[in-house]
Design a protein with these regions (language model features):
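Acidic, Ser/Thr
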Residues: 88-94
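N-terminal secretory signal peptides
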Residues: 1-38, 45-55
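C-terminal edge beta-strand
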Residues: 147-155
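Proline-enriched interdomain boundary motifs that mark the N-terminal boundary
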Residues: 66-75
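Surface-exposed, flexible coil segments in extracellular/virion-facing regions
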Residues: 102-121
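Solvent-exposed loop segments of extracellular immunoglobulin-like
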Residues: 94-100
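Conserved small-residue
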Residues: 25, 155-834
Length: 834
């Protein structure tokens, strides 16, 4: 209002107009303010939420039309967890010396470029729709501030890509908007002075080249020091990966050779070929980095390393020094040579890598007469060797183990690298005179420090001996003993859990003596085996000497001590009554809930007569090309919830997350999960959850399923699927009738909620491959995947795949295929899958 001037009394309170400047009145400011508009200048795309628009003034003097600025900052927008959100502000009038974005509400996010007009952030993980609020501020040349607010509503994470169709093409296919880079191939050199790979069978020196059959894999961020971990390193790191096996035919100019007979039937292998084949097994440690355009590996890095069946090993834990580990090479049973058939893996929070020895038994030769030499068929060692599949040959047969390495006659007669594959008793004295105990040196979990090339890998015997597929640690909670979950990958074998004797301490995640931390958590604890009941409950049965039937009085196998129990974990599981499963493969733990998932890849020996609640299907899966697969042909994924959600629990509940099946198979008894053309799969194998350092591992994590299949390959090559699973018990019970071989049997199983659109196909691989091994950078924006044995059914004169040479386009002439690691990135830089 105007101040009155017609005062009639002598009183003077000083309230008179002495301001003769040209500055505006309040009415002028109001007029200025209400002449402006709030506008929305953008929206949401599939990958990015962009918020623009309206304005709000912080104070009336900020509307000074000569000195103030007017800013616009956006109306409400919406997005989902993991998406990149762009906030765009504008200066609608006036001149600003600075602008800034700030968050004022909701779960805290990190604003990139907050002191510019355009700021970005990654939408956080949420369990329900959640609103975040932000303020955009502009400051005039006279220091007057103007600000306005906007909001973004974030919904829970969802898969946001179009499912990749099934395919028989010889190429890696990914969704639109994603790119594939081939990173690390069989034969790639990893040291200075090693030549490029010729890929014609002539190459040697695989101790300094990439091995074959890339499998389980972990990424470790590398700090600027070049030798220490960086848990947040997204552009430089160490990639550690297994080389499970070989495609023998492609490693030599004209395939593998032998003299005096066929390989595996008395033929003698050349030493040079056998050495190459051995060196192609094992593990790679390589440094990788990301430039502005792509990922590549660093061929001359000092951290590059191959670990092979020739690498010195150390034993740790309860079996170290046991008589059954003593050999001609290690007379005190504390050391060994090499690791082999390394399948899945484990990534430890103290930055070490666990590699796991799977199908190791087939590499050994055991000649006729060895059973008698060890005391007859009922002698303990013979019972043990038979239970692990190491049987003597028939009288008229000479089997030299997988690839015939035991047949090699080395140029150096003192060289025992090949003789050790013969576990026949030959010495007149004890086991230190031959390699009768060499098989007991395999079947273990092996821990590697990737940051120390001089370190000796340690075989962790407290985790038991079996066909170790993988070893996945559960959630680590301060003061709680961590658990490590494992599958024994063979038909009708068991699921195991090791609970450390030591409660978790968060400080150990940054310790510099990494293998010593492994000693702390992995050398002492309790190994358990799973028993699953028909009512959906289950128990972890302890493999502890002296408890229950695990004593020297046991008639199946008289256990001598705890070391004997661990060496013979399968026999211990037998007498405890563990549940036989349909080939337990990879394990993975949901980082948000702690629930453990395990792939049961398939089981050709499952019959209608022996189905049970946790392995409820036996059926015929016909092939379009003729023939059929029987048993549990397509496999399933089971999951367990620990009682009290604690890793220390000895009881659990379970259900089956999803059943593999073709979408065209019987929906009542086979395709129980209601799979369709976007997500039907067969033989689940690799399994991994996104990391909790990004939205794929928080609140509603993304689970990745890889396949290793033979039943559905008439329809599609192997694949990678993404899923956002629920929780144990989110479905119900289901009666399932199996009909096979003239027998029918009905059991009631527990099945999770049908996945529908929360499960979809993300990748299809090239011909004759397995999709296996998966990990990501901490930010979830680069996904590493292994393509194993493409073209495995061919050979030098019959090349059945040219991948990866043809990934960028057709090749003029066929190229020998190479197992390889690929990197998948999103073209807009976003988080993979979301």
């Amino acid at each position: 209002m105007k101040i009155p001037t017609n005062m009639t009394m002598a009183y003077h309170d000083g309230d008179i107009d002495t301001n003769t400047s040209a500055n505006p009145h309040l009415n002028d400011l109001i007029a200025v303010r209400y002449s402006r508009r709030q506008t929305l200048m953008g929206g949401l795309s599939a990958a990015t939420a962009a918020v623009f628009g309206g304005m709000l003034l912080a104070g009336c003097d900020e509307d000074d039309p000569r000195r103030a600025v007017t800013v616009q900052a956006g109306a409400s927008g919406a997005t989902s967890a993991g998406k990149t959100v762009t906030l765009t502000g504008t200066v609608a009038s006036g001149s600003a010396t600075g602008v800034a974005w700030a968050q004022t509400g909701g779960p805290a996010v990190t604003l990139a470029n907050a002191n510019t007009a355009t700021a970005t952030f990654t939408a956080p993980s949420v369990a329900a729709d959640t609103t975040l609020t932000f303020t955009f501020t502009g400051t005039s040349t006279d220091g007057i501030r103007s600000e306005t607010s906007t909001s973004v509503t974030v919904s829970p994470a969802r898969l946001d890509f179009t499912a990749v169709p099934k395919s028989l093409a010889d190429v890696v296919a990914v969704p639109a908007g994603y790119s594939v880079t081939v990173l690390y191939r069989l034969g790639d050199p990893i040291a200075t002075g090693v030549g490029a790979y010729a890929n014609d069978g002539s190459d040697t020196n695989f101790a300094r080249r990439a091995g074959d059959h890339h499998d389980g894999m972990s990424y470790f961020g590398l700090a600027a020091t070049g030798s220490t971990p960086d848990a947040n390193g997204n552009t430089r790191g160490l990639l550690v990966l297994n080389h499970e096996n070989i495609t023998q035919a492609y490693l030599h100019p004209n395939g593998a050779t032998s003299t005096g007979g066929a390989i595996g039937a008395g033929g003698v292998r050349p030493e040079s070929e056998a050495l190459k084949e051995m060196e192609c097994h094992g593990v790679s440690v390589i440094e990788i980095s990301r430039s502005a355009t792509a990922w590549s590996y660093v061929p001359a890095s000092a951290l590059n390393r191959r670990i092979t069946p020739l690498t010195p090993m150390s034993f740790s834990g309860p079996v170290r020094g046991n008589a059954l580990l003593r050999t001609r090479y290690s007379t005190d049973g504390t050391a060994g040579r090499g690791t082999i058939n390394n399948c899945a893996n484990g990534t430890m929070p103290w930055h070490t890598y666990l590699t796991n020895e799977e199908n190791w038994a087939g590499y050994f030769r055991r000649q006729f007469g060895d059973v008698a030499a060890r005391g007859g068929s009922t002698a303990k060692q013979n019972v043990s060797l038979a239970r692990y599949g190491i049987r003597e040959t028939a009288n008229a047969t000479t089997f030299n183990g997988n690839y015939g390495w035991a047949s090699v006659v080395p140029a150096d007669s003192a060289n025992t690298l090949y003789a050790r594959w013969n576990v026949t008793t030959t010495a007149a004295t004890d086991a230190t005179g031959d390699f009768r105990n060499e098989a007991f040196q395999y079947g273990w979990v092996v821990e590697i420090d990737p940051f120390d090339p001089a370190s000796t890998p340690r075989k962790r015997t407290a985790l038991g001996r079996m066909n170790h597929e993988g070893c996945e640690i559960g959630r680590t909670i301060a003061g709680v003993k961590p658990a490590f979950y494992m599958g024994d990958d063979a038909q009708n074998e068991y699921i195991y859990k090791f609970v450390s004797a030591t409660p978790w301490s968060a400080a150990d995640a940054t310790a510099t003596n990494r293998l010593a931390i492994g000693d702390k958590y992995l050398d002492s604890g309790t190994l358990y085996v799973a028993k699953l009941n028909a009512d959906g409950s289950g128990q972890w049965l302890p493999l502890v000497f002296g408890q229950g039937p695990l004593t020297s009085a046991n008639t199946t196998y008289p256990f001598a001590d705890q070391a004997d129990v661990l060496i013979n974990a399968r026999l211990a599981g037998d007498v405890l009554g563990a549940t036989k499963m349909d080939r337990p493969e990879w394990t993975a733990v949901n980082p948000a809930t702690g629930e453990m998932y395990c792939t049961l890849t398939n089981n050709s020996s499952r019959t209608a007569a022996n189905v049970d609640a946790s392995n409820p299907r036996a059926y015929t899966d016909p092939k379009k090309t003729g023939g059929q697969t029987t048993g549990n042909a397509n496999g399933h994924v089971i999951r367990l919830r620990e009682t009290g959600d604690t890793s220390e629990a000895t009881a659990f509940t379970w259900d089956i997350y999803a059943f593999g099946a073709g979408s065209d198979l019987d929906a009542t008894n086979i395709n129980l999960s209601g799979l369709d053309a976007t997500n039907d799969f067969s033989s689940p194998d690799g399994l991994w959850f996104g990391l909790p350092s990004n939205p794929t591992g928080n609140v509603t994590p993304v689970m990745w399923i890889e396949t290793d299949d033979g039943a559905y390959t008439d329809v599609t090559n192997c694949m990678l699927l993404a899923a956002i699973p629920g929780r144990v018990g989110d479905g119900g019970t289901r009666a399932v009738t199996s009909t096979l071989g003239g027998t029918s049997n009905t059991v009631t199983t527990r099945i999770g909620k049908a996945p529908a659109t929360t499960l979809r196909r993300f990748l299809v691989g090239p011909k004759e491959c397995e999709i296996t091994g998966i990990h990501s950078t901490p930010d979830g924006r680069s996904l590493f995947v292994n393509i194993q044995h493409p073209g495995e059914n061919g050979g030098p004169t019959n090349i059945t795949s040219s991948w990866p040479a043809n990934q960028a386009g057709a090749v003029a002439t066929p190229s020998r295929p190479r197992s390889s690691t690929i990197v998948i990135t999103k073209n807009d830089g976003g988080i993979i899958g979301l």
